[in-house]
Amino acid sequence: MANGIIVIDKPQEWTSMDVCAKIRGVLHERRVGHAGTLDPMATGVMPVFVGRATRAVEFASESEKEYIAGLKLGVVTNTQDTTGQVVEERPVEADRADLEGALAAFRGEITQIPPMYSALKRDGKKLYELARAGKEVERAPRPVTIHALEVVEQTGPNCYTLRVRCSKGTYVRTLCHDIGAALGCGGCMSALRRTEAAGFSLAEAVPLEALLDAPDPAALLRPVDAYFFRYPAVTVEGTALRKAKNGNPFPCSAADGDWRVYGPGGEFLLLGRCAGGMMSTIKSFFEV
């Protein structure tokens, strides 16, 4: 049975669910999840959790993400990226200095109105389904945090590359759209590559075709406790081990805080929280 994490470099034109479905078939494991959707046009870091490791998705999904994005000024589309239909073209008077000046307003805590072409739901229907039917509904602004935002380079007339580090739930194409609006010329996203997610970088990512061609695909999985490497480790046995496996708090001499908890044979049991000499389970990962 396959259990663990594989960081995929998602290819263009694949949906995140396409990638998960392919991995599900290759590894013969129905429990497969990912830590953050990438649009089909996007490429880059996509951590995929397999088997018992899917229990870690909720932690990974909350993490910051980093992107390299293409920004095209002077063009507005219905999807806020270059895959959509052009709805407006405007002259661009802004130069790189103007762009860099405009970015200041988008750093820190901001609000975004989610795009109609998104998987968010309204009355049980996904927004993109309504958009394709020619309907537009009101969307409430949502708070997001832009931790870093900078111009990397100018790649052509009115075209730039941006580096974006942001919180969960940020729409980079909406960011591009809003930056263009702030400059008075409109804009859209022309490319997107995720360079970091859930603490994993492009250097750790495996091309999807490498997984599909591997003689032993399961060998490419890293253990789920690798995701929690920042936490200290403690080993339990005897009565404490039995209580841990029953989901009960157990005595522990560890300092207060969160810990990786292992059995005497090195099996990763759970992520726990120690307080006042007692360890309680945050999330268990052992085989039942």
Language model features by range: what are they?
Residues 137, 169, 277-280:
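A short local loop/turn or secondary-structure capping micro-motif enriched for an aromatic residue
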Residues 1-9, 13, 17-34, 38, ...:
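Accessory RNA 3′-end/elbow-binding domains used by RNA modification enzymes
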Residues 1-167, 174, 178-204:
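Catalytic cores of RNA-modifying enzymes
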